[in-house]
Amino acid sequence: MEESQGYLELYKSGQHDFLYPLIFQEYIYVLAHDHGLNRSILLENLGSDNKFSSLIVKRLITRMYQQNRLIISANDSNQNPFLGHNKDLYSQIISEGFAVIVEIPFPLRLVSSLERKEIVKSHNLRSIHSVFPFLEDKFLHLNYVSDILIPHPIHLEILVQTLRYWVKDASSLHLLRFFLYEYRNWNSLINPKKSIFVFSKRNQRLFLFLYNSHVYEYESVFVFLRNQSSHLRSTSSGALLERIYFYGKIKHLVEVFANDFQAILWLFKDTFVHYVRYQGKSILASKGTPLLMNKWKYYLVNFWQCNFYVWSQPVRIYINQLSNHSLYFLGYISSVGLNPSVVRNQMLENSFIIDNAIKKFDIIVPIIPLIGSLAKAKFCNVLGHPISKPARADSSDSDIIDRFVRICRNLSHYHSGSSKKKSLYRIKYILRLSCARTLARKHKSPVRAFLKRLGSELLEEFLTEEEQVLSLIVPASSTSRRLYRGRIWYLDIICINDLANHE
């Protein structure tokens, strides 16, 4: 959102047709590919009156070009971009440019929505970890959870139709429709053999945007039904509905929905229903009965098929009881268990033993899938025994260590919310010994002799920032070190490490 800030100021002038001219500016695709650009230049010299001017845009993209040598040249290929052998490259370039352009109107809607709801530090809500404290507070009081596999649209035209409510630029939508139809048969866009919508890594930004736009349409109706059927209205659900990728959030729907759905609201008188979406799936948790959960199940299936033209089946929604079911969610295994405790009550000459059970929300790291991810990346075998990385043997020692340390710290950072740290210690051991084996293989030395020569230097490299600070200022037996072994949630994690994602 920051990299488009300069264009947002121009968009505020009311020129809604501003998007279409940007599509044909080759510099916009440089912006799409750039990640290290000094974004402050977008905030400078926008003009005193902030009116729309193609000259302002030209000056901005010229300044960006002066700091970026990555430019799309027509001489790179004489092939037709849609028919030539470079179609994968051009698909990536065009889709990333489209994604940057169509995202421009949405940050303004988000900012205005957050200002109305007086939400401070909204960037913290984008963190994946911000979901888990919510689950800790709510799931202890709920009984059932539904694992929902979100259906994908059966036709690309549905995605374009969804954007009509957000982007008032018919020319841009027509060109987007042409682009989607031109590539609709490519395996890199949609794989028809799978039951869910699959995004290409090369076109991920655009198609995640289109997919989230489509899903948000029926989620808006879902939030409306939830608020209408609940005596406790939620004022912030519009901003907290999707925290990861999607920008546009709204507060209310048009009043026509009240007439369409009033007849079925009596089915869903549930004041404790919570919804979370992630990675093409969603979770619907409730304090209600199995009958109520089944009503939600069949209603969602009919709602998707009749109103949004997506194919779904009841078997795609699994209803489980939280007390005896573990939930695999964003790289963690979450469960609600009972923590038994015995209380002795003394009354005069009589004493009583009272058995008491307290619900506890437990979150652990799934060690077997994580080791499987490490084995797939060639850090260890399927049994978890560390192996060397021959592909890294031609790098310098410092580069090899930095790469292993970066992976180790990223995994530790993401899985810091685990209530059991022993699994993380095993992962650190695998990465540390794999790094040592890689270095020993490079220097043609035995691993034991190489570790003896390095001593504790290699071990210190793999310590996280928190462990380094605690090792300096906190004694090993203090309560602060025991506190570190508890769950820690970070508000700066907006993506999942590939090794942590076992989906």
UniProtKB/Swiss-Prot annotation:
Its main location: plastid. One of its GO terms (molecular function) is RNA binding. One of its GO terms (cellular component) is chloroplast. Pfam families: Intron_maturas2, MatK_N. InterPro entries: Domain_X, Maturase_MatK, Maturase_MatK_N. Keywords: Chloroplast, mRNA processing, Plastid, RNA-binding, tRNA processing. GO terms for biological process: mRNA processing; RNA splicing; tRNA processing. It is found in: Plastid, Chloroplast. Belongs to the intron maturase 2 family. MatK subfamily. Usually encoded in the trnK tRNA gene intron. Probably assists in splicing its own and other chloroplast group II introns. This is Maturase K.
